[in-house]
Regions:
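Short hydrophobic "helix-edge" motifs at membrane interfaces and signal-peptide entry regions
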Residues: 13-14, 61, 128-129, 206, ...
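Conserved hydrophobic residues forming the short capping helix/wall of the S-adenosyl-L-methionine
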Residues: 2-5, 29-33, 87
Length: 263
């Protein structure tokens, strides 16, 4: 990283997030930081996940353009200069596309292709590789976003609501030499749940009253069903409904819809 950026001739800083590592990573990073003022290390006391790491990096970054990359050495830093050049053409986000991805087909590539197709369809922002961490962002774009869960992978889709311009570029991807991936089925489930959240936000963030309108209609329909049933019980079945909690519940649901209609 330092060799590539140093030869590039541009000013830069490197922010490394130690996401609760259990080996000697932090000790090594601390020694490197002592000898290079451009390196900044942020340490989490426990593992908070990639989204929290991204959020911390965005918050502490001081440059106008921010590059993100995984720590598994599969992303190639030599792609950063060309991606920055693309951003300087006027794009707010430049996304990497690992077209020749060096991962197992069944366990990584196939699920990734399916996930990218689903995310692109659900969000309306079509990218080949949402999971590629190698991206360039304009600082003002990501610093205004609030991230949680597994939402780092949806950044382009979330930011699209701000009217940003997005480009995608083919980048190099190297085979993993050290460690093993922590991605598994539980991670996939969390991603799906967060995708539902993102879809909800993208659908109603600019028209929040519509969701309340839908909720109000549902409540009104439920109230009509409840009171209609109770009316049937009283008139046809000739049973008393005065002491039934459902009567009060149905009336409240109906009045909530009537009140919404007159606001």
């Amino acid at each position: 990283m330092t060799q590539t950026l140093g030869a590039w001739g541009r000013s830069y800083e490197i922010i490394v997030i130690d996401d609760g590592s259990t080996d000697d990573s932090f000790a090594i990073l601390a020694r490197l930081q002592a000898s290079d003022p451009r390196l900044r290390v942020i340490r989490f006391r426990k593992n908070f996940g990639q989204t929290a790491a991204f959020a911390a990096g965005f918050a502490h970054a001081r440059g106008r353009l921010i590059a993100t990359s995984d720590g598994d050495l599969q992303n190639d830093p030599r792609d950063i200069p060309m991606m920055v050049a693309k951003a300087e053409e006027g794009y707010d986000i430049v996304c990497g596309w690992r077209k020749s991805r060096q991962d197992a087909w069944l366990s990584r590539l196939l699920p990734s292709k399916i996930a990218n197709a689903i995310i692109s369809r659900a969000t309306g922002v079509r990218l080949h590789d949402y999971g590629c961490s190698l991206k360039i962002f304009r600082a003002e774009v990501v610093k205004s976003l609030r991230l949680y869960g597994e939402m780092h992978r949806f950044l382009p889709a979330i930011a699209s609501e701000m009217g940003v311009t997005i480009a995608e570029m083919v980048v190099n991807h190297r085979a993993r030499q050290h460690g093993t991936s922590k991605y598994g089925i539980s991670r996939t489930i969390r991603v799906i749940l967060d995708l539902l959240t993102v879809k909800f936000l993208l659908s109603y963030s600019t028209r929040p009253l519509q969701i309340f309108g839908l909720i109000g209609l549902a409540m009104g329909a439920a109230g009509a069903l409840v009171t209609g049933y109770l009316a049937y019980v009283r008139l046809i079945g000739e049973q008393s409904i005065a002491n039934r909690p459902a009567l009060l519940f149905g009336i409240l649901l109906l009045f909530s819809e009537i009140g919404r209609a007159h606001v």
